[in-house]
Amino acid sequence: MKHVTRPLFAAAVAATFALCGPAQAQGLKGAPAPFDKGGVKIAAVSFLGAGDWLQAFEAGVKRQADALGVKLTLSQARNDNDTQRNLIQQAINLRVDGIIINNGRPEVLKDIAQKALDAGIKVVAYDVNLDNPKIPQIEQSDADMARLVLEQAVKDKGKGFTGGAVYVAGFAPLDRRYAVWKEFAGKYGLKEKAVWGVVNDTVPASVADQTKAVLRANPDIAVVFTPWGEFAKGVKLAIDELGVSKKVKIYGVDISTADIQLMTEPDSAWMATAATNAAVVGEVAVRAVSLAIAGQFPGRSVMLKPTLVTRDDLLKNKIATIEDLQKKFSAFQKSDAATAAWIPAGK
């Protein structure tokens, strides 16, 4: 595990927080306290530090925060546990009103999240189970996403196919999605030949190297389940380099404009994915923590429903971007999760 020296960390945090604009001084008309007066501060702390999904998530966070007139801070731990804890502590020290924790490891975050609660700060978590009744969990039904895409894999390839999965244990969404893969393996007689994966700053490149070795050693693999978009990118890169796109197919989770472009390339191996709109997830996270700040607890679980998107769907509908997808698939436009009459829509 890498460690960040205090001077470098301080500089990084200062730069991150300097990006934030002023909160809306006049407040929101008709909103409950403290939003009626303005000056509300929210911090969104992400475990990841790169990728199309994170970019879209943060865009959604910013869009909804702007609509609420919130002073927002965005920070990324770049896959480092210590840095994520430090960023949350920094948010506590700044006396923000709410913290959004985006991904991470539960065993690393439970105590620091409780520390925020003890300081009177509202906390919501996305894709990391902090097992705390006071912390709403923003969830995109990981099990449903995995089931949707694996049902498509069985439909396309039939029962009993030989496959592999890219998976790293200890991340709640990956754990839940991989559990469904194991469920399907038992139910449909799927043969799991290999499991591989890594979470670092260069996921696609690292996974590509691993995948090439796996596919060379296991030429009978016909399907690769990728429970994260960055994994899928790496697997596709490996398949393309090995020239086996007609033989090995990818069934994944998550979607972005870059993913759509990869799925619609000629002879692409990426056949289907199941996802929610990352930008909508970001909007919901801000609404959920805002409700908590206003004393309107959004519930222990705030659920977003996923949608299956196949390569055929994209090609037939001439979909090239997330914006195109939103026009064709209404589920990608918005969510009614964690809403209230006083919360304006993000623009």
Model segments located where?
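A residue-level marker of the well-folded mature domains of exported/periplasmic proteins
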Residues: 3, 25-347
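Bacterial N-terminal signal peptides that target proteins for export
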Residues: 1-11
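Bacterial N-terminal signal peptides
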Residues: 10-20
